[in-house]
């Protein structure tokens, strides 16, 4: 069975970069990222590995909702200037890069789902909790900085909802980190309580008469914003990748076919 290690490039690199005392020291960054990748390969022993990078195009989410990720700090200039050299160094280490047109998240999600559907195992290396929506027994998420897999049970307890309700929670309460709006006046706690009672968005919105007038009014007025927020939070898993697995092979394995759109 193929085991594909899928690294969220900027999630890893920017966290490492933030810990470097001298932000212009690209040599130190390269050494630390190389060491991290070497450790990832040693710990997980994958058959395939790829590091996925964000692109420069405006994402479809930003086009749909211009305030999406508004206020995010731009990439520090030294890192922006040194990124290509770092990527070349990783290529020399036989860690192939995949370049997304815009956001890496959708490419990572697509690659993970396609790997799992092909009876392989996908390990996503990222601290981004958004990947927890990929509810498949052959997909796991590894936090390199804490050296542990994402604890879904702990996340469910923290959020107050089941994994299958993650997107419904984002639709109602939004996500301040990504500037996903949710419904005005509905916070994470009240959203979790609503989902505990009604289980899903369709059931909730068809049961507004069972709620108090004030809360029902908020939900009714915010229904379209909830739909928008759901769409913004949902990862795309059906992008055309057109990659050949042999380009990302770490160890000897059987010849692989091209991963394409189903």
From Swiss-Prot:
Organism listed in the record: Shewanella baltica (strain OS185)
Region described as Interaction with DNA: 185-190
Disulfide bonding pattern of the chain: none
Listed InterPro entries: 5-3_exonucl_a-hlix_arch_N, 5-3_exonuclease, 5-3_exonuclease_C_sf, DNA_polI_H3TH, FEN, HhH2, PIN-like_dom_sf, Xni
Residues noted as binding Mg(2+) in the record, renumbered to the chain: 105
Tree of life domain: Bacteria
NCBIfam families referenced in this protein's UniProt entry, alphabetically: PRK09482.1
Cofactor annotation: Mg(2+); K(+)
Family: Belongs to the Xni family.
Protein name: Flap endonuclease Xni
GO molecular function: 5'-3' exonuclease activity; 5'-flap endonuclease activity; DNA binding; magnesium ion binding; potassium ion binding
Gene3D superfamilies: 5' to 3' exonuclease, C-terminal subdomain, 5'-nuclease
GO BP term, example: DNA replication, Okazaki fragment processing
Function as written in the Swiss-Prot or TrEMBL entry: Has flap endonuclease activity. During DNA replication, flap endonucleases cleave the 5'-overhanging flap structure that is generated by displacement synthesis when DNA polymerase encounters the 5'-end of a downstream Okazaki fragment.
Listed Pfam families: 5_3_exonuc, 5_3_exonuc_N
Enzyme class: hydrolase
Chain sites annotated for binding K(+): 172-173, 181, 183, 186
Lineage: Bacteria, Pseudomonadati, Pseudomonadota, Gammaproteobacteria, Alteromonadales
Enzyme Commission (EC) number: 3.1.-.-
Keyword Cell cycle: no
Family annotation (PANTHER family): 5'-3' EXONUCLEASE FAMILY PROTEIN (PTHR42646:SF2), FLAP ENDONUCLEASE XNI (PTHR42646)
Keyword Phosphoprotein attributed: no
Keywords of this entry: DNA-binding, Endonuclease, Hydrolase, Magnesium, Metal-binding, Nuclease, Potassium
